[in-house]
Amino acid sequence: MTILKWALIFLVVSIIAGIFGFTGISAASADIARILFYVFVVIFVVLLILGFTIFRA
């Protein structure tokens, strides 16, 4: 269940980065937040798949 916990953490982080990046708070932080959003979404999906397949007890 540890991998799934990390997957959920990365999901929350990606949502927070998306909130800051997609609402137009500032131009500089928006670009960084958009990049972080997509990075964390990819990490979330990878960890979610691994949690349900390889790392299952």
UniProtKB/Swiss-Prot annotation:
Q: Which domain of life is it from?
A: Bacteria
**Chief subcellular location:** membrane
Q: Which residues form a coiled coil?
A: none
Give the residue spans that cross the bilayer. Answer: 6-26, 35-55
Q: Which InterPro entries match?
A: DUF1328
Query: Which Pfam families does the record associate with it?
Result: DUF1328
Q: What keywords are assigned to this protein?
A: Cell membrane, Membrane, Transmembrane, Transmembrane helix
- An example Gene Ontology CC term for this record: plasma membrane
Q: Which family does this protein fall into? A: Belongs to the UPF0391 family.
Q: Which HAMAP family did the record assign? A: UPF0391
Which named protein is this? Answer: UPF0391 membrane protein RPA3029
